[in-house]
């Protein structure tokens, strides 16, 4: 009951303030279009990179303030993208940006009311483990997924998961295990300790073999000698377990997948995974990230699978302290495993009384950033800007015609 009050009542109390309250509404506007120009076949990756939270030191908000705004050709290069398929083949798609008005200004930052703090879990842990199936199997918590590489992600369509790029690629190569990448969705078990399974025998075998938790690879059921069992381990009735689905293809912006041409840019630490099987639960739509002043209470929300809470979905909310054009610094208590989670807001629908949640950033994790020549680590999220919205929308729909507004 306490969790319910925290999640839902907070939105109602915003309307009880003064008449000068900000307009917390999703405002749709025409955005630039990212259009595919040509696709080039590349050599297959080796899938030998080690999965890590971040590669070296990245350019954070203070570092970005000293950089000039990128040109149109640079943006088109950053937004061009790699696609790697389940059979190991890889392509590079060059894009063109249409309808963009460039502003000849440097990257700017906006500071919140509070000074930033170094990352850790402070005093009383403010995270909530979602254990009640009434929450766990319902929106918005059922949009959170787990990657077999150890990260989290968010379902943004029946067939697509948004996550952090570093969960599958270190900037030079794809990480070990990403060639047979799987996505796990928490499901409740039915009577008898098994979840319902539909579809072909082949897809069931994939789900069951993939459903073996990476943390417990040796679990198995008793079987007759000489006969292979296709059935996964039994789970106690009423307990959630992961249903695993193979990833069909992975899209990563060239701003992150630099190869030998440079270090990955933190601004582009996001990736989209296309699943082999559509998911039936409700997904969360994308939204363009508003400024701090447009956040109700200055807060953001996200749920993920923190490593210190074994296979539990963990929810948290916190304040944003500072933002640039592409990044957010925030105070959320989080541990490894939650990176890649979709950060969302709850704002009003235009012209309606209804409130709607949308994903406006991807949690990149505890990153080492360059702050005036000194290395410091902070909680960082990558904002979904109009251009990134257009790019991710192109990945989801396959054409720019469906991505005119965001």
UniProtKB/Swiss-Prot annotation:
Xref: PROSITE patterns: TRYPSIN_HIS
Highest taxon listed in the record's lineage: Eukaryota
Basic residues: compositionally biased ranges: 186-204
SUPFAM superfamilies, A to Z: Trypsin-like serine proteases (SSF50494)
Pfam families from the UniProt entry: Trypsin
Disulfide bonds: 151-167
Record: glycosylation sites: 87
GO CC annotation: extracellular region
Domain (Peptidase S1) ranges: 121-401
Coiled coil, from the record: none
Gene3D superfamilies: Trypsin-like serine proteases (2.40.10.10)
Statement: the UniProt record of this protein carries the keyword Cell membrane: no
InterPro entries: Glutamyl_endopeptidase (IPR050966), Peptidase_S1_PA (IPR009003), Peptidase_S1_PA_chymotrypsin (IPR043504), Trypsin_dom (IPR001254), TRYPSIN_HIS (IPR018114)
Region ranges (Disordered): 186-248
Leader peptide range in chain numbering: 1-17
Keywords of the record: Disulfide bond, Glycoprotein, Secreted, Serine protease homolog, Signal
Subcellular location: Secreted
Family affiliation: Belongs to the peptidase S1 family.
Protein name: Inactive serine protease 35
The organism of origin for this protein: Rattus norvegicus
